[in-house]
């Protein structure tokens, strides 16, 4: 025997209303703006409520409370005036039987007094989903007393077990077999998820389906001729750790075969790490080109871009831009060190070179002075050379110091400067003297 469907009675959390306008909005929502029929309680002979009388009915309900002050601001109201309940049936249930059973249940629980009191209520029967269900909006103010409707586990009549059992008995009379057992009786002890959690999971599932549809649409673009090129696996092999096919930067023959453009046909998500590997490899090749002084691979590729159909124009522009960026700064190998740095290095080399020259001249006075050669690198400048002419080195140093010095120096013929001659003249005339 298949398992019987469970009775579904749900008290909507936060479904109660506190103001007159909220009652109007709730009833208009249940009637789908007047498209569906709202039905009164058995006390009003089960007659339908016309859509144009919703405002009048809502005002009568707030007046029945006896405590509703229309001059009070709505944000200060705390008393809930209505309770929203949903009675749901399994999919495929007869709509007529479901409507009759749910209406009878609402009349017995809230209109007959069997539930501890008599209350006004309205119902709306919806069949917009697979499972038919009835919305019940109950006016919480008791008709023959001064109490308020309260459904709880401790209530003698209006508790959750009593609501399910009565619904199962009434449904059976209308040919609908339902089970009213509790979760503990069915061996289910885990706490169920709340309605808010269910709605949140439902929204997440819709979002995932939407993202999957976007991925399928983007993957379908691979059939376009623009994305039909075969991927170039050389950059992947090169970035995998210098295998046999890895082009070393110092090898010009192998380096010229490196493809610096991105392989076509890869998505943005999968190509993120590929782009990082390509950029790292590209920068390493350019750095090695600059240190070695040879033309970079990008210049070779850019020069043959018109002949090579595999390299797109955008790639040539990017690589050319890299070469221009690196070529703006002159290298020390071509230009040499700056003026101040060159003087400092030459000063370091003059001392030992002059002493060495004096020793050589004392030992062999006939030996001609050696030619002064310019050092080819910074290390050669700092290294002392005994074959260098001390007079030429000292003369060159004096010439450099003379150009860099700000104060005028005494000329080679020993004549004093104009300022010194004027000071000497004043001292001879007796106008000079010690200054105090």
Swiss-Prot record:
Bias (Polar residues) ranges: 216-232, 316-325
EC number from the UniProt entry: 3.1.-.-
Biased composition (Basic and acidic residues): 408-429
GO molecular function, one term: DNA endonuclease activity
UniProt keywords, alphabetically: Crown gall tumor, Endonuclease, Hydrolase, Nuclease, Plasmid
Pfam family, one: Relaxase
Keyword Transmembrane helix in record: no
Top-level taxon: Bacteria
Region of interest: Disordered: 213-266, 290-436
InterPro entries linked: Endonuclease_MobA/VirD2 (IPR005094), VirD2 (IPR016644)
GO BP: symbiont-mediated induction of tumor or growth in host
Protein function: Tumor formation by A.tumefaciens involves the transfer and integration of a defined segment (T-DNA) of Ti plasmid DNA into the plant nuclear genome. The virD operon encodes a site-specific endonuclease that cleaves at a unique site within both 24 bp direct repeats flanking the T-DNA.
Name the UniProt record assigns to this protein: T-DNA border endonuclease VirD2
Organism annotation: Rhizobium rhizogenes (Agrobacterium rhizogenes)
């Amino acid at each position: 025997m298949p398992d019987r469907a469970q009775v579904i009675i749900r008290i909507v959390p936060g479904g109660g209303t506190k103001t007159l306008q909220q009652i109007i909005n709730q009833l208009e929502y249940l009637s789908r703006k007047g498209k569906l029929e709202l039905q009164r309680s058995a006390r009003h002979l089960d007659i339908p409520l016309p859509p144009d009388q919703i405002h009048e009915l809502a005002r009568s309900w707030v007046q029945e409370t006896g405590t509703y002050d229309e001059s009070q601001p709505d944000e200060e109201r705390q008393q809930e005036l209505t309770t929203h309940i949903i009675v749901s049936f399994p999919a495929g249930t007869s709509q007529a039987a479901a409507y009759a059973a749910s209406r009878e249940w609402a009349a017995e629980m809230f209109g007959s007094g069997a539930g501890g009191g008599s209350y006004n209520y309205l119902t709306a029967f919806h069949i917009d989903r697979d499972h038919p269900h009835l919305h019940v909006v109950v006016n919480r103010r008791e008709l023959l007393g001064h109490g308020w409707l309260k459904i709880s586990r401790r209530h003698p009549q209006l508790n959750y077990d009593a609501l399910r059992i009565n619904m199962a008995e009434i449904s059976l009379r209308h040919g609908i077999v339902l089970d009213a057992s509790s979760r503990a009786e069915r061996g289910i002890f885990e706490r169920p998820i709340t309605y808010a959690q269910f709605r949140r999971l439902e929204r997440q599932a819709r979002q995932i389906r939407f993202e999957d549809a976007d991925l399928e649409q983007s993957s379908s673009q691979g059939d376009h001729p623009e994305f039909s090129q075969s991927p170039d696996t050389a950059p992947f092999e090169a970035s995998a750790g210098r295998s046999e096919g890895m082009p070393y930067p110092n090898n010009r023959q192998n380096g010229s075969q490196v493809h610096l453009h991105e392989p076509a046909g890869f998505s943005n998500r999968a190509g993120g790490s590929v782009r990082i590997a390509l950029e790292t490899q590209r920068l390493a090749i350019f750095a090695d080109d600059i240190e070695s002084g040879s033309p970079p691979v990008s210049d070779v590729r850019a020069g043959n871009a018109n002949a090579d159909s595999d390299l797109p124009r955008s790639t040539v522009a990017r690589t050319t831009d890299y070469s221009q960026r690196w070529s703006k700064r002159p290298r020390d190998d071509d230009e040499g060190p700056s003026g101040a740095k060159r003087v400092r290095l030459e000063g370091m080399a003059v001392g030992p070179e002059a002493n060495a020259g004096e020793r050589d001249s004392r030992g062999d006075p006939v030996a001609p002075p050696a030619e002064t050669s310019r050092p080819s690198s910074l290390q050669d400048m700092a290294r002392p050379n005994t074959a260098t002419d001390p007079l030429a080195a000292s003369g060159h140093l004096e010439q450099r110091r003379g150009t860099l010095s700000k104060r005028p120096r005494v000329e080679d013929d020993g004549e004093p400067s104009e300022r010194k001659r004027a000071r000497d003249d004043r001292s001879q005339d007796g106008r000079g003297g010690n200054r105090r």
